[in-house]
């Protein structure tokens, strides 16, 4: 009798003393679901330049230059362009270009970018602040992935502000293994995928319903630059 009561007491202690898992089940965190995919509409008529509409956002046409009155001062710049991302309440300036990795010498970079040869090009995006955080600008640095990295969804870049970092990985899971077919760029916060984009002739976009409104705008801006790339 006493042994039975003791065992029951120990079981209760172990039950209530075990760490509580505060994470949602893995299935609930899957990004690639129908309800989180945004339809991408492309407007590319005979007499109009290409624009994109996805989710609540629309881009202007791409302008092939760095915008005036900005402080982008890289010495080596290739294929610069800029556009505006618009929703119902604001518009955000987005600029993009290619520049060698050496342009970021002296700046902190994650290991997967730091190890890139100095002359290798990086795709660079500068995103102006949103209405609620007008002074906070974001930048994205992205290297060109190797197909072996795509096979394993390896990190190839970073989207960051002064106090926030979002990892960017890339994979070919919608295409063929050992290939560059249907490269999907995935944005991750604390290891969880929160957005993804497949550029190209048949683009696809996913954005998690769990991200905050301001983060969603920044992700949408980065996605727009990758669609235009």
Regions found by a protein language model. Name each.
Residues 18-229:
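Intrinsically disordered, low-complexity proline/glycine-rich segments
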Residues 4-14:
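Sec-dependent N-terminal signal peptides
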């Amino acid at each position: 009798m006493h042994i039975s009561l003791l065992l029951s007491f120990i079981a209760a202690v172990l039950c209530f003393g075990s760490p509580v898992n505060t994470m949602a089940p893995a299935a609930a965190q899957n990004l690639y679901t129908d309800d989180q995919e945004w339809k991408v509409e492309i407007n590319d008529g005979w007499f109009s330049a290409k624009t994109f509409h996805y989710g609540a956002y629309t881009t202007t046409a791409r302008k092939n230059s760095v915008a005036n009155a900005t402080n982008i001062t890289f010495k080596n710049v290739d294929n610069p362009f800029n556009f505006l991302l618009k929703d119902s309440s604001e518009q955000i300036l987005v600029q993009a270009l290619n520049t060698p990795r050496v342009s970021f010498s002296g700046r902190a970079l994650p290991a997967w970018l730091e190890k890139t040869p100095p002359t290798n090009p990086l795709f660079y995006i500068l995103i102006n602040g949103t209405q609620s955080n007008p002074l906070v600008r974001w930048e994205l640095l992205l290297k060109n992935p190797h197909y072996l990295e795509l096979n394993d969804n390896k990190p190839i870049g970073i989207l960051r502000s002064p106090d926030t970092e979002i990892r960017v990985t890339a994979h070919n899971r919608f295409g063929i293994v050992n290939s560059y077919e249907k490269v999907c760029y995935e944005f991750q916060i604390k290891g969880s995928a929160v957005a993804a984009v497949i550029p190209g002739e048949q683009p696809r976009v996913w954005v998690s319903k769990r991200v905050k409104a301001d983060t969603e705008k920044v992700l949408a801006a980065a996605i727009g630059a990758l669609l235009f790339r």
